[in-house]
């Protein structure tokens, strides 16, 4: 039976770089992100370049009902997933009290709740299969508070500590849990979070490929 690596946030940045790195190693992939057109183009390109099977699913992980539907599709499809890469994430910047609450809620849904739910659903599947791997993408932001990005920094601290705890819990099931904590990386994140990109350009940013 074909084994798949499932990658969220796979349409750009670190998620895309990890997808390419895994395809280069011959891994079959399931790519998840919001942008269907981008995913389709990426799937075609990776298949042509590396000769691997690449499936994709457009899904907004910030919407619990859509995530439920996606998880049901995975269960009914009976595809064996032995690697989960939780790379989807978002950020906001500015005074917390000035933020739009729905945007803050979306951040919590994507960065915390969707990641946790995917770990629970696919972790159970991996345990039944006899093992697997989970990679959760956090950030160096996980190690310190972040005024004017308080929710984002807190969400990454959650990912770090959740992953560290889960690593101990799932060790006996043959499941390896790792957490990636990259520094500032040249992705679309900063623009989406409405950060001062001119200031960031003066810093030494890593490329997504270097992180992957």
Model-derived regions, located:
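Residue(s) in the substrate-gating loop at a strand-loop-helix junction
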Residues: 139
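Conserved glycine-rich cofactor-binding loop
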Residues: 11-13
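SDR active-site lid
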Residues: 167-212
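Conserved glycine-rich Rossmann-like NAD(P)H-binding loop of the short-chain dehydrogenase/reductase
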Residues: 25-42
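Conserved NAD(P)H cofactor-binding loop of Rossmann-fold oxidoreductase domains
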Residues: 87-92
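Substrate-binding pocket helix/loop in short-chain dehydrogenase/reductase
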Residues: 95-108
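Active-site helix of classical SDR
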Residues: 119, 155
């Amino acid at each position: 039976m074909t084994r798949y690596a499932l990658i969220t946030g796979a349409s750009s940045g670190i998620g895309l770089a990890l997808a390419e790195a895994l395809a280069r190693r011959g891994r079959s992939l399931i790519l998840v992100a919001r942008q269907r057109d981008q995913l389709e183009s990426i799937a075609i390109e990776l298949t042509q370049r590396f000769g691997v099977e690449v499936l994709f699913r457009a899904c907004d992980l910030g919407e619990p009902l859509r995530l439920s539907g996606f998880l049901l599709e995975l269960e009914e499809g009976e595809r064996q997933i032995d690697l989960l890469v939780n790379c989807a994430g978002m950020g906001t910047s500015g005074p917390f009290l000035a933020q739009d609450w729905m945007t803050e809620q979306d951040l919590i849904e994507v960065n915390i709740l969707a990641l946790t739910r995917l770990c629970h659903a696919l972790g159970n599947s991996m345990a039944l299969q006899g093992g697997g791997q989970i990679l959760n993408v956090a950030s160096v932001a996980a190690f310190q508070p972040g005024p004017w990005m308080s929710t984002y920094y807190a969400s990454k601290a959650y990912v770090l500590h959740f992953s560290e705890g889960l690593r101990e819990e799932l060790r006996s099931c043959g499941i390896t849990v790792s957490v990636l904590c990259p520094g500032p990386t040249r992705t679309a994140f900063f623009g989406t979070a409405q950060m001062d990109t001119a200031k960031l350009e003066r810093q030494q940013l890593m490329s997504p490929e270097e992180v992957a």
